[in-house]
């Protein structure tokens, strides 16, 4: 018989940087998950992507065991990395803080495609362009 699912936990954690401190510890502790076990598994799986923020969906079962699925980094984080910026604009319609090329946007769209609800690459590209626009990043080309 399959294990009964008791809940899902969605977090965004720096790759290779999961530790029992907030926000990871309290979120997992509420569901009774072994925090250190999750941290070890997550850090081992995401070690190669150090420095990126990785969204993770943790499925908690009735016997307090868990499984987790990592997603691709948020488009905003990837855009900031490509534009070599620390953060986006506070007033994106007035202050432009950086630029990215269309090739960089396509590269991000290809990377994000599995997690986006778009039919084709063009739709995914348009979503990434919209994210860039809302962050005050100009897309050239």
Swiss-Prot record:
Pfam families: Ribosomal_L11 (PF00298), Ribosomal_L11_N (PF03946). Keywords: Methylation, Ribonucleoprotein, Ribosomal protein, RNA-binding, rRNA-binding. Coiled coil: none annotated. Belongs to the universal ribosomal protein uL11 family. Disulfide bonds: none annotated. GO terms for molecular function: large ribosomal subunit rRNA binding; structural constituent of ribosome. The keyword Ribosomal protein applies. GO terms for biological process: translation. This is Large ribosomal subunit protein uL11. Part of the ribosomal stalk of the 50S ribosomal subunit. Interacts with L10 and the large rRNA to form the base of the stalk. L10 forms an elongated spine to which L12 dimers bind in a sequential fashion forming a multimeric L10(L12)X complex. Forms part of the ribosomal stalk which helps the ribosome interact with GTP-bound translation factors. One or more lysine residues are methylated. GO terms for cellular component: cytosolic large ribosomal subunit. HAMAP family: Ribosomal_uL11 (MF_00736). It comes from the Bacteria.
